[in-house]
């Protein structure tokens, strides 16, 4: 059974985002193990934000697929690349990087509205990001997207997730 069909591809092209429930459900437990390993042994790229009010921290780290075996296994043995190529109308896809974000319930840190593309420092229109929730989340805590915003050619200067300019 395919999780992404032609209607999904059409909606992704038009809206820039789609919801695919359960698409990687067979991988969630393995990815959770990888996240636990990462939190226990973060990379030099780790950037956690500790709220001044004492609420839960916001952990983030990126580019760990080559040292966390669970991430490597997911990237090379799941349908991630296949689904990416479908959504991009491409015969192939290339993996750019992983980015783990862990915001515990009750954290006062708000993720700022942003576009992913300015963070990547690459050109091109064929790009897809997968946001994979490893825990149940409320509607208030989930990712929100602005349908069609990818078509505007307007890029906003990226900020760190505590609101400072990234560069």
Where are these regions (language model features)?
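Short loop segments at secondary-structure junctions
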Residues: 22-23, 105, 134-138, 149-150
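Double-stranded beta-helix
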Residues: 138-167
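Short, structured patches in soluble enzyme cores that scaffold and shape functional sites
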Residues: 99, 115, 132-136, 147
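Conserved hydrophobic/aromatic beta-strand scaffold that supports enzyme active sites
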Residues: 17-19, 129-133, 145
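Hydrophobic, well-ordered secondary-structure segments
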Residues: 81, 116, 127-131
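Short, conserved beta-strand element in jelly-roll/cupin
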Residues: 121-138
């Amino acid at each position: 059974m395919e999780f992404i069909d032609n209607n999904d591809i059409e909606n992704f092209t038009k809206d820039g985002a789609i919801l695919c429930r359960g698409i990687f459900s067979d991988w969630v437990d393995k990815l959770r193990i990888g996240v636990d390993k990462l939190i226990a042994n973060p990379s030099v790229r780790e950037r956690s934000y500790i709220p001044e009010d004492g609420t839960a921290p916001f952990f983030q780290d990126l580019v760990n697929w080559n040292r966390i075996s669970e991430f490597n296994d997911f990237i090379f043995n799941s349908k991630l690349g296949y689904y990416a190529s479908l959504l991009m109308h491409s015969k192939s896809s290339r993996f750019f990087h992983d980015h783990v974000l862990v915001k515990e319930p009750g954290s006062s840190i708000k993720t700022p509205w942003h576009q992913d593309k300015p963070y990547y420092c690459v050109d091109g229109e064929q790009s897809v990001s997968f946001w994979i929730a490893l825990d149940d989340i409320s509607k208030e805590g989930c990712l929100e997207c602005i349908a069609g915003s990818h078509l505007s050619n307007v890029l906003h200067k990226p900020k760190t997730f505590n609101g400072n300019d990234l560069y």
